Protein backbone atom coordinates (compact mmCIF):
# COMPACT_ATOMS: atom_id res chain seq x y z
CA UNK A 1 0.00 0.00 0.00
CA UNK A 2 1.26 3.48 -0.85
CA UNK A 3 1.18 6.52 1.45
CA UNK A 4 -0.89 8.32 -1.20
CA UNK A 5 -3.68 5.73 -0.75
CA UNK A 6 -4.09 6.31 2.99
CA UNK A 7 -7.18 7.95 4.44
CA UNK A 8 -5.24 10.95 5.73
CA UNK A 9 -5.44 14.65 4.86
CA UNK A 10 -3.21 15.78 2.00
CA UNK A 11 -0.88 17.83 4.26
CA UNK A 12 -0.24 14.71 6.36
CA UNK A 13 0.56 12.62 3.28
CA UNK A 14 2.80 15.40 1.94
CA UNK A 15 4.66 15.45 5.28
CA UNK A 16 5.17 11.66 5.17
CA UNK A 17 6.46 11.83 1.59
CA UNK A 18 8.84 14.66 2.55
CA UNK A 19 10.11 12.43 5.38
CA UNK A 20 10.96 9.75 2.79
CA UNK A 21 7.95 7.44 3.14
CA UNK A 22 6.24 6.25 -0.03
CA UNK A 23 5.14 2.67 0.72
CA UNK A 24 4.09 0.78 3.82
CA UNK A 25 5.85 -2.31 5.15
CA UNK A 26 3.71 -5.39 5.94
CA UNK A 27 3.36 -4.60 9.70
CA UNK A 28 2.09 -1.12 8.79
CA UNK A 29 -0.35 -2.52 6.22
CA UNK A 30 -1.57 -5.06 8.78
CA UNK A 31 -2.11 -2.25 11.31
CA UNK A 32 -4.17 -0.27 8.79
CA UNK A 33 -6.25 -3.38 8.04
CA UNK A 34 -6.76 -3.91 11.81
CA UNK A 35 -8.30 -0.44 12.16
CA UNK A 36 -5.36 1.81 13.07
CA UNK A 37 -6.84 4.79 11.20
CA UNK A 38 -10.39 3.96 12.34
CA UNK A 39 -9.82 4.40 16.07
CA UNK A 40 -9.46 0.70 16.91
CA UNK A 41 -7.05 -0.33 19.67
CA UNK A 42 -4.37 -2.71 18.43
CA UNK A 43 -1.24 -4.53 19.56
CA UNK A 44 1.65 -4.45 17.10
CA UNK A 45 4.35 -7.06 17.54
CA UNK A 46 6.97 -6.49 14.85
CA UNK A 47 10.75 -6.77 14.61
CA UNK A 48 13.08 -3.88 15.28
CA UNK A 49 13.37 -1.51 12.28
CA UNK A 50 10.09 -2.73 10.76
CA UNK A 51 8.37 0.64 11.05
CA UNK A 52 6.61 0.72 14.42
CA UNK A 53 7.33 4.44 14.79
CA UNK A 54 5.59 5.09 11.47
CA UNK A 55 2.59 3.13 12.79
CA UNK A 56 2.52 5.49 15.79
CA UNK A 57 2.88 8.51 13.51
CA UNK A 58 0.04 7.35 11.24
CA UNK A 59 -2.23 6.89 14.26
CA UNK A 60 -1.32 10.36 15.56
CA UNK A 61 -1.91 12.06 12.21
CA UNK A 62 -5.24 10.32 11.76
CA UNK A 63 -6.40 11.13 15.29
CA UNK A 64 -5.27 14.77 15.26
CA UNK A 65 -6.86 15.41 11.87
CA UNK A 66 -10.26 14.24 13.15
CA UNK A 67 -10.29 15.06 16.88
CA UNK A 68 -9.50 17.75 19.44
CA UNK A 69 -8.21 15.47 22.20
CA UNK A 70 -4.67 14.68 23.25
CA UNK A 71 -2.21 12.04 22.12
CA UNK A 72 0.05 10.45 24.74
CA UNK A 73 3.14 8.47 23.78
CA UNK A 74 4.42 6.31 26.65
CA UNK A 75 8.01 5.14 26.85
CA UNK A 76 9.76 3.11 29.55
CA UNK A 77 13.01 5.03 29.08
CA UNK A 78 13.89 8.73 29.11
CA UNK A 79 16.36 8.29 26.24
CA UNK A 80 13.72 6.63 24.04
CA UNK A 81 11.21 9.33 25.01
CA UNK A 82 13.68 12.05 23.97
CA UNK A 83 14.36 10.31 20.65
CA UNK A 84 10.65 9.96 19.84
CA UNK A 85 9.94 13.53 20.97
CA UNK A 86 12.39 14.88 18.39
CA UNK A 87 10.72 12.74 15.69
CA UNK A 88 7.16 13.72 16.66
CA UNK A 89 8.09 17.40 17.01
CA UNK A 90 8.48 17.49 13.21
CA UNK A 91 4.69 17.08 12.96
CA UNK A 92 4.25 20.61 14.33
CA UNK A 93 4.82 21.96 10.82
CA UNK A 94 1.84 20.05 9.32
CA UNK A 95 -1.18 22.28 8.68
CA UNK A 96 -4.05 20.13 9.95
CA UNK A 97 -6.41 23.05 10.53
CA UNK A 98 -4.79 23.75 13.88
CA UNK A 99 -1.26 24.24 15.18
CA UNK A 100 0.03 20.95 16.59
CA UNK A 101 2.04 21.36 19.79
CA UNK A 102 4.35 18.60 21.00
CA UNK A 103 5.84 18.39 24.49
CA UNK A 104 7.90 15.98 26.59
CA UNK A 105 7.90 15.48 30.35
CA UNK A 106 10.01 12.76 31.90
CA UNK A 107 11.33 14.42 35.06
CA UNK A 108 10.10 15.11 38.54
CA UNK A 109 7.41 12.54 39.32
CA UNK A 110 5.94 14.55 42.16
CA UNK A 111 5.05 17.59 40.08
CA UNK A 112 2.34 18.29 37.56
CA UNK A 113 3.65 20.20 34.56
CA UNK A 114 1.02 22.89 34.04
CA UNK A 115 1.97 23.46 30.39
CA UNK A 116 1.12 19.94 29.22
CA UNK A 117 -2.57 20.82 28.98
CA UNK A 118 -1.75 23.12 26.04
CA UNK A 119 -0.11 20.32 24.03
CA UNK A 120 -1.58 17.93 21.47
CA UNK A 121 1.17 15.28 21.50
CA UNK A 122 2.66 14.54 24.92
CA UNK A 123 5.66 12.22 25.29
CA UNK A 124 5.99 10.74 28.78
CA UNK A 125 7.74 7.96 30.63
CA UNK A 126 5.40 5.39 32.14
CA UNK A 127 6.29 6.61 35.63
CA UNK A 128 5.53 10.23 34.73
CA UNK A 129 2.11 9.20 33.36
CA UNK A 130 1.45 7.34 36.61
CA UNK A 131 2.36 10.46 38.59
CA UNK A 132 0.14 12.71 36.45
CA UNK A 133 -2.82 10.36 36.93
CA UNK A 134 -2.24 10.16 40.70
CA UNK A 135 -1.93 13.95 40.99
CA UNK A 136 -5.17 14.49 39.08
CA UNK A 137 -3.89 16.35 36.00
CA UNK A 138 -7.16 17.60 34.49
CA UNK A 139 -6.08 17.18 30.87
CA UNK A 140 -5.82 13.40 31.30
CA UNK A 141 -9.57 13.24 30.64
CA UNK A 142 -8.90 14.70 27.17
CA UNK A 143 -6.66 11.84 26.05
CA UNK A 144 -8.02 10.19 22.92
CA UNK A 145 -5.00 8.20 21.71
CA UNK A 146 -2.39 6.36 23.77
CA UNK A 147 0.70 4.80 22.21
CA UNK A 148 2.48 2.46 24.61
CA UNK A 149 5.94 1.55 23.35
CA UNK A 150 7.84 -1.51 24.60
CA UNK A 151 4.58 -3.06 25.84
CA UNK A 152 6.38 -6.35 26.54
CA UNK A 153 7.62 -4.71 29.76
CA UNK A 154 4.15 -5.28 31.18
CA UNK A 155 5.56 -8.68 32.19
CA UNK A 156 8.58 -7.16 33.95
CA UNK A 157 8.47 -7.59 37.72
CA UNK A 158 9.77 -4.06 38.36
CA UNK A 159 8.13 -1.91 35.68
CA UNK A 160 5.22 -4.12 34.67
CA UNK A 161 2.78 -3.28 37.46
CA UNK A 162 3.05 0.49 36.81
CA UNK A 163 2.52 0.03 33.07
CA UNK A 164 -0.43 -2.31 33.62
CA UNK A 165 -2.03 0.08 36.10
CA UNK A 166 -1.73 3.19 33.92
CA UNK A 167 -3.05 1.37 30.84
CA UNK A 168 -5.99 0.10 32.88
CA UNK A 169 -6.75 3.60 34.18
CA UNK A 170 -6.43 5.09 30.69
CA UNK A 171 -8.75 2.43 29.22
CA UNK A 172 -11.37 3.41 31.81
CA UNK A 173 -11.38 7.10 30.90
CA UNK A 174 -14.73 8.43 29.76
CA UNK A 175 -13.13 9.37 26.41
CA UNK A 176 -12.35 5.65 25.77
CA UNK A 177 -8.99 6.32 24.10
CA UNK A 178 -7.63 4.25 21.27
CA UNK A 179 -4.61 2.33 22.56
CA UNK A 180 -1.77 1.31 20.27
CA UNK A 181 0.63 -1.09 21.99
CA UNK A 182 4.03 -1.60 20.32
CA UNK A 183 6.69 -4.25 20.90
CA UNK A 184 9.52 -5.94 19.07
CA UNK A 185 9.88 -8.81 21.51
CA UNK A 186 6.46 -9.75 22.86
CA UNK A 187 5.97 -13.51 22.86
CA UNK A 188 2.32 -13.72 23.91
CA UNK A 189 0.78 -11.14 21.57
CA UNK A 190 -2.53 -12.99 21.19
CA UNK A 191 -2.93 -13.41 24.94
CA UNK A 192 -2.01 -9.79 25.67
CA UNK A 193 -4.35 -8.23 23.10
Predicted regions and their residues:
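Conserved ASCE P-loop NTPase core motifs with emphasis on AAA+ ATPases
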Residues: 1-15
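Conserved P-loop/Walker A NTP-binding site and adjacent catalytic elements of P-loop NTPases
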Residues: 13-15, 19-193
Amino acid sequence: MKIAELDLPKPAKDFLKAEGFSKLYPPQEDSIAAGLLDGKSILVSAPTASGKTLIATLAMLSYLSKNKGKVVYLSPLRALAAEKFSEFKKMEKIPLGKKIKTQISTGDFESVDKTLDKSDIIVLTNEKMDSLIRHGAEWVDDIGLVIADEIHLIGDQDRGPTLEMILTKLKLLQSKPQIIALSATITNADEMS
